[in-house]
A protein has these predicted regions:
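Short glycine-/small-residue-rich flexible loop motifs, especially phosphate/cofactor-binding loops
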Residues: 2, 90, 217
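Short secondary-structure boundary/capping segments
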Residues: 2, 26, 194-195
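Histidine-rich, glycine-flanked metal-binding segment
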Residues: 8-9, 13-43
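Polyanionic/metal-chelating signatures
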Residues: 95-219
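Metal-associated gating/positioning segment near the N- to mid-region
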Residues: 37-96, 101-104
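Single conserved hydrophobic/aromatic residue that forms the stacking wall/gate
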Residues: 1-7, 12, 220-229
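N-terminal-biased segments
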Residues: 43-55, 166-177, 218, 222, ...
Length: 229
């Protein structure tokens, strides 16, 4: 429901052939406009959230996969730069009522920033509705599976490196904050972290269980990462 309310376009679907026959900008429509919707379904445009749409064309072709960069801490990665507005996958979305999408990166601990695009555009600049609207963080898991290639039991077990992985993420926050306070010529990673540390940017935290959610929220809301003093 929330996604539909945000959409700025209205779709009209013909019940007889189940196809979208009309797209109209709901912001510019006058309240006295009369639309003959007989035998039609009317609903707002849908937004695809947290998707690699336009970043991946064919999974098996490495050259067409741009949603996952090498490295662990990559806040400077901007998924919008790699967005392909002419992707065949993008073209298939509008006829099905999906008019906007949140293009998000994958991989690493800090994957990078996502942007919101509208799906009727010639290039990524034309498509962009909102630049770099949030940073995506994959929280470490307190559990892990055995590595079969090392002849380990494949069952679920406690991740003995969980504390050090969390500490690494916390240290990265603190280092970025320190660079902001003392170094005017910050490196690219610290610049990308500035909006998070100042509380100006949305953080999307990926977590699988209660402990990860609590630990992630405690890190981000603790005085250390966001203290502006």
């Amino acid at each position: 429901i929330a996604n539909c309310l945000v959409g700025s376009e209205m779709c009209i679907r013909d019940r007889s052939d189940d196809k979208l026959n009309s797209f109209q900008d709901s912001k510019n429509e006058k309240y006295d406009t009369i639309i003959d919707a007989t035998n039609h379904h009317i609903y707002p445009g849908i937004i695809a959230l947290n998707t690699n749409l336009g970043l991946v064309e064919i999974d098996a072709v490495k050259a067409s996969v741009d949603d996952d960069e090498s490295g662990s801490y990559l806040p400077e990665i901007r998924s919008i730069i790699a967005y392909n507005a002419e992707s065949k996958a993008v073209e298939s979305m509008r006829p099905n009522g999906v008019l906007l999408a949140q293009i998000a990166p994958n991989g690493g601990v800090i994957s990078g920033s996502s942007s919101v695009v509208q799906l009727d555009a010639w290039n990524w600049e034309d498509a962009t509705v909102k630049y770099d609207q949030g940073i995506h963080i994959n929280w470490p898991s307190p559990y892990t599976y055995g590595r079969w290639w090392l002849d380990e039991d494949r069952g679920l077990k406690v991740n003995n490196n969980y504390s050090s992985q969390v500490k690494g993420l916390k240290d990265f926050f603190e280092k970025s904050k320190a660079n902001m306070n003392v170094n005017k010529s910050m490196n690219i990673k610290s610049k990308a972290m500035k909006s998070i540390i100042n509380g100006e940017s949305t953080v999307y935290l990926y977590a699988d269980d209660e402990k990860e959610i609590v630990d992630g929220c405690l890190l981000y809301t603790s005085p250390s990462p966001r203290d502006s003093s």
